[in-house]
Amino acid sequence: MNHSQTQDAGQVVRTVRPGAPSPVVLVCEHASAFMPASFDNLGLSEDVRRSHVAWDPGALGVAEALSALLDATLVASGISRLLYDCNRPPEAEGAMPARSEIYDIPGNVGLTEAQRKARTDAFYRPFRAAVGAALGSRRVGGYAHLRPRPPA
């Protein structure tokens, strides 16, 4: 990917093709399994951190391909959904889950309000700001939130 087509805001959120002409804005909330070292992997094994519980493997590649095909802006989270699930508001229990799928998430158990606020400020707010900036630069006649799921 050409660096001139990407704007980074640290590892929290990445905007690809910020000035793209398409009215479409793509959002990929579960693009990464990254966890900053200060979170000590939330107490999880490498196998769990690399599994679907931490991110949606392949989602970023699909989103980047669609971004290129549509010449559309893409906003992608740069952190694991276990640190903060960016498609959930701060008050949602699942924004920082103590359990996900079949796994307990030790680093999310017993979070204080101050810890939840710190994560909200560090991860959710920058992500939402990037989505807002991408949407705000377009004339929008409506929204469609598409969430593809694998067949059951």
Model regions: which residues?
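N-terminal catalytic or cofactor-binding beta/alpha core of small enzyme domains
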Residues: 1-152
